[in-house]
Amino acid sequence: MSELLFDGMSLTVEIRFGGTWTDVTEYVRNVSTSRGRSSELDTYSTGSCNITLDNRTRLFDPENTAGPYYGNLTPLRSVRIKATSGATTYDIFRGYIEQWPQSYINPNDAFVTITASDAFKVLNMSILPSHWEIAIGAEKLRWFRMADFSGSFYVFDSANSRSTSAQWMSSAGAGVTSFCNPGPPLIVGESTTSSAFDGARFVQAVDPLGINGVTPLYSEWSVEMWIQTTETEDGNYGIWNHGDFIHGGSLGMVVAGGNATLVGQFGNRGNSNAMYTNNVQVTVNDGRPHHVYMTYRSNPSSFTVQELYVDGSNLDVSTGSFTDVVEQGYSFMTIGAPIYKSATASNNFTKYFRGSIQEVVVWGQVFDGSFGNEPLDHYESGSGKRYQGDLTGLRMAYLLGFVNWPYDLTDLAAGQSTVLGLITTGKNVLDALREMETAEQGRLFISKNGSVKFVDRNALGEGNFVTVQAQFDDLGRNDVNHGIPYTDITFTYDDRYIFNDIVVRQPGGNFAEAEDSTSQSKYFKRTSTIDNVQVDNGYLLTNIAASRLTQYKDPEIRIDSLTVNGRAEPAKQGSILNLEIGDRVTVIRTPAVGTEIEKTLIIEGVKHSFTTDSWIVTFNTSPTNNAPFVLDSSLLGVLDTNVLGY
């Protein structure tokens, strides 16, 4: 059949069979894609794609055992569509195939129309795992976030009131020192590899004065964390260590015969001169996240409680007392690094842990019946947890990290709003991400290259949102400066976008309300409610309500959509293909009577339709009345045109 080639612009369709992309363009009969939303008040929907493939030779028949793709024609295969114009290649769509339906028109013709959805569908199916759980009430001596997305980690004491020295170091000993002063937790280290613990980096918290001004660890303590690994190479791997002469402890992983189990070791030098080892016979290298909780209590000359829990259950086998001890003579803590004890130690953890270690919390007590069982309850799903103080973009990064979303398909702004911590495990990731979008009043969509894209409020006043990326003209405008010609345009002027009473609610019932009596006297009272806004401060609720009221208290002539024939003018094809959701464009209409009408708009959605002889593009658009007011900006510095930002 003919190639999808339009006046110098060519389309390419690739499917990922196995680990490589395969070009199937020669079999494509038609393609249609849809991304974005109809208007700025809608939620960005899951992008979709339909591709019809010639199947007369049964290349795309899952039951054709002689076919080259047999065994790989399965749901959720990656598919991507690109277009090349001139020397530039542009992304159109990337997603995941849902089905391979077989169609037989007659003995001489057969085709497959595959449907695909973008990453929103995958994230909608991804449920937040239980290792989001962390304590909300009890006192924490140390808390290491071990953020997956950047390799950073946080450390702070229970009250955020002490100046505790904290240090990140490389395995070569180089490092930087920061302090945990009063205020929010600090990023005290930055390493692109520490989150994977691949031997290039490890983290170390140094506190030579001890924790809370007493002995390096209490005579009673416990440590909690989540680990995830697929390590099968035999050896002893360091996970966590706090060494001292009196109350030291360590946790490691022993891999033997490809099977990995955990070992907890406890020292009490100066008293019984012994080490107590707990060996939990639960395989932990299955690639799943595992909750670990290790306890220690001394009275001080005898051991009373040393237990190791995995996934909420105490399954340890106590292997007895030994003459070797925890040798480090000063207080420090290492995570994911080798742990050297003594020449006679039963387990010297000589290797770097390879995998993921998350949410390391050191407690100043052992949780049992008299204190509650909080850390063990963290393993149970559904009870929720709190991270107080994350910015919206950072929270999104955690959400994506906990379901192992690829870094190269992630494009997140930092965020401007600080959010509440309430997240319930068991909800899907997409819903949790959209909560952050609402809190920020930003934009969350899947870009044309398949990335999860988050634009915060600050970015809405920069870049493509501010600088016009293209101009559209009707076909009656033919001067040398004309823009992309459009074939159809939809104007609206109705009551759908009139709201003069805005109510914004936090979880728990706190709310802010903004009203405009003048608008209500003209158009009646029209209420819009935004629920479950996860901001941590009431003034942000007020700002959201005021901003939304300014945008929608009065009607406005809108351009909801415009349609372009991509083949009408080959020289404009690159400009069409370059446009993306969130881009600023101008549209000019030449009426039969009067002067030109010019509107500045934001692209909200993009649809492409390709056949062997046609290419039609539809853009959904919204007004720019939600652009912020920016001082000293010739474009965004005009009152009564822009919204005062917050």
What are these regions (language model features)?
Residues 48-50, 113, 141, 220-224, ...:
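Intrinsic-disorder/low-complexity, polar/charged segments enriched in Ser/Thr/Lys/Arg/Asp/Glu/Gln
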